[in-house]
Amino acid sequence: MSRTEASGWGFSLLQILLVLAGMVWKAREGFPIVDFLDTSGDTCSWLNPCIVPPALSCWNNWPWFALHLFLYTTQLVGLSAIILPPVYLIRMLGLSTALPLISLWVLHRRRRTGKGWATTFPPRHGEEAFLWRVLWFTGLAHVASFLVATAASFLGREDMAPWHLTNTLLGTPDCSYLPCSQIAERQARLRQINEMTGTSSGFFLAVALFSQHLEMNGARLGAGLLARLFFVSLIAGPAAGAADALLLRSAFMRTRRST
């Protein structure tokens, strides 16, 4: 097995682990693995109404869920703009399961079609400028969300409780005793599952594409570069980390063409 194939299987194993983590997490929280649209109101598809909650629920509960909804939506929009194809699989399985499965399809496309990973998402005109916009937009949104939640946590006032880290970005509020809707709490829990597993999958897919392209050209993804990508993802969010990985891939391709 070549180094490129070994790396591909390693990233594939990571995507499988993310699939299993998302499915187990959803099952433990009482969510169906397959999200057939349910209009009963006590459960929800990951896409609707979890991203666009019903107007009344949003109006009554917005202080408790607005910050995480903003963070999740900006990350999802960024990843969708970069790598997420509009297939029905996403709608049925949810981001936490479908994106790792799509990532597996992308990573093994070469074995089925003979096309390299670099051709899966070939550079397009204006791609770098677009990726820079995604990186800055999603990165600033991610940092701003954590700054707001951190400030609310340090202030410690009761009126700031809806913005506290434990009620927004590190967890969801316990609406069994807090003044918020338990239906909205379940929607927030599903968004949290999708964020932790689905958006992580998108980031690792972008890193895998960059790594495979390097190895196909006789280079490799070193520890320093990998640490830089993780640092960007940790601080600026997985969408910004994915954009950064694809920007590095474009820079490497441009350098190869000029030499």
Curated annotation (Swiss-Prot):
UniProt-annotated location(s): Membrane
Transmembrane segments: 5-25, 64-84, 87-107, 134-154, 221-241
Main localization (coarse): membrane
Gene Ontology CC entries for this record: membrane
Keywords for the protein's UniProt record, in alphabetical order: Membrane, Transmembrane, Transmembrane helix
UniProt membrane topology term: Multi-pass membrane protein
Family under the similarity heading: Belongs to the ltmS family.
Function statement: Part of the gene cluster that mediates the biosynthesis of paspalitrems, indole-diterpene (IDT) mycotoxins that are potent tremorgens in mammals. The geranylgeranyl diphosphate (GGPP) synthase idtG is proposed to catalyze the first step in IDT biosynthesis via catalysis of a series of iterative condensations of isopentenyl diphosphate (IPP) with dimethylallyl diphosphate (DMAPP), geranyl diphosphate (GPP), and farnesyl diphosphate (FPP), to form GGPP. Condensation of indole-3-glycerol phosphate with GGPP by the prenyltransferase idtC then forms 3-geranylgeranylindole (3-GGI).
Full protein name: Indole-diterpene biosynthesis cluster protein S
Organism: Claviceps paspali
